[in-house]
A protein has these predicted regions:
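Hydrophobic ligand-binding cavity/cleft-lining segments
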Residues: 1-65
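Glycine-rich portal/gate segments that line the openings of hydrophobic small-molecule binding cavities
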Residues: 60-109
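Terminal "cap-and-tail" regions of soluble proteins that handle hydrophobic small molecules
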Residues: 1-5, 113-189
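Short, surface-exposed coil-to-beta transition loops
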Residues: 23, 77-79, 107-113, 126-128
Length: 189
């Protein structure tokens, strides 16, 4: 893993990946079949609905947009996320977000590129996530670099906690999909 190169034909992606303010990497395992993992990555709005159904924390508010999703995080992060590449054993997402927090100036915005790569084995996914973030102005970039240690710890904590909730959801999707269909009131999933 670590070999997936995002689509750098889009200049904003090349800028984020080529000159990030911070980069976070995490290897992880999921006890789920590849088809379930890929469908989860390919349907972020549906996953947001399931996240809400399970009352996972943080309680993200997820709405669908023309080309992806809009996410409001109760801790003050608001952003848009869209998939920019779908390759065998990899997905790449691009996001742009702002922070709405009393301690962070309103002009603090950042772009991010998230690359998920994985290897398949029967019933197990060995994956890696790489999150590259770049501040949208020199002040944002300077603050992100200055507080990179704190930022990385917060990203790791959030990613790890979200991953635990995701494991429960994916397990139920694979082993008890009717529970989710009934909870969402949909039979088409």
């Amino acid at each position: 893993m670590g070999s997936q190169t995002p689509d750098v034909r889009e200049p904003f992606v090349a800028e984020v990946v080529g000159n990030p303010s911070v980069v976070y990497r995490k290897a992880f395992f999921l006890e789920v079949h590849t088809e379930v993992w890929e469908k989860a990555l390919d349907n972020p709005f549906l996953m947001g609905q399931i996240w809400a159904l399970y009352r996972c924390q943080p309680a993200y508010q997820v709405t669908q947009t023309d080309d992806g999703i809009h996410i409001v995080d109760p801790t003050g992060i608001t952003g848009d996320l869209r998939r920019i590449e779908r390759a065998p054993l990899a997905r790449v997402f691009y996001g742009r977000g702002t922070f709405d927090h009393w301690a962070i100036p309103s002009f603090f915005t950042a772009d991010g590129v998230i690359v998920f790569e994985w290897k398949e084995t029967p019933g197990l996914i060995a994956a890696e996530a790489t999150i590259s973030m770049r501040g949208n102005n020199w002040i944002s970039r300077a603050v992100m670099k200055l507080f990179s240690g704190t930022l990385m710890r917060r990203i790791d904590s959030r990613f790890t906690n979200n991953l635990e909730s995701l494991r429960i959801i994916l397990s139920d999707i694979e082993r008890n999909p009717q529970k989710i269909r009934e909870g969402l009131g949909r039979e088409d999933i």
